[in-house]
Amino acid sequence: MKFIVSSSQLLKQLQVLGGVINSNNTLPILDNFLFELSENELKVSASDLETTMSSVVDVESESSGSIAVSARLLLDTLKTFPNQPLTFKTEGENTIEISSDQGKYDMAYFGGDEFPKSVSLPSPSKTIIPANILGTAISKTIFAAGNDDLRPVMSGVFFQFSSQSLTFVATDAHKLVKYSRTDVTADQTAEFIMPKKPLNLLKGILGGSDSEVTIEYNDANAKFTFDNIVLVCRLIDGKYPNYEAVIPKENPNKLTVDRASFLNSVRRVSIFSSKTTHQIRLKMAGTELNISAEDLDFSNKADERLSCDYQGDDMQIGFNSRFLSEMLNNLNSNEVLIEMSLPNRAGILTPIDGTDEGEQVTMLVMPVMLNN
């Protein structure tokens, strides 16, 4: 087996795939990249058994074969080369030789048949989404997904496809984000829960792509295909909670405020909040929004005023500043609308501007009880 490949091209693809590999694998073979050579195409794969990702690299070759090589050793070596052609050639018993302008390097390899086979999806359903829209949907929702192993369904993002719209939802029971697109639709209705790890991998590479992503899925797995990349992952098993039921419908108190100013105030004031609750207090009256926090243990206190447009009864409500900051940071609008009803009911954040036609973002944050 012998091939010649550009060092920078190979490194670029391997760095993308390297995110799949866990630092502590139960199967030693999973510490490797799988190389499958078929004349002028080299297919490189990485897997953690739950997620398998592969990409195709153009090479010069007249041979074929499959081997598994150490991911860490190969990545560390490739990072040190300036862009140049490298020759990979299998030598004798389980050794592959890499030749560069600078010298020669020998690495051990395993037989490719030891590497776990990628899952095939028999008769899957299929939906096609522009890469930039899927990338945005993941970015807007993934931060709100939970980390609770006892509630695995809430540790992923819920994909809801229909002939009217595509909806993506994430929640950890303290905050919730619902992102919808009516300008992209599916042929048939489908629902599944995607784990966070493959979504983070996709998020990192979809941003730079202007192609379309083909999503194939069944009850157990999903497959994403775009450009020269294929990602197959196991879905989270279980039923997603009825998120619509927790979004309050009647919210008479409406606060409109400059998003960047509000975000900066929340960040500043939260420095003085309790390190356990991160609680900040919002006090609305007329055209004034008062943001305050207090840490009684250390006698720290902060108080800021912002001008705003507020319609409704004067009220005070407490929020976790970390959740509020995350949400405000994730919106692109100049102004944000916060709708509330009572101090013990959730607040709803929506952007006033900056969304595409057919794009809708709803963010919900649960209040914290104010200690007077």
Predicted region positions:
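Structural preference for solvent-exposed beta-strand-turn elements
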Residues: 1-372
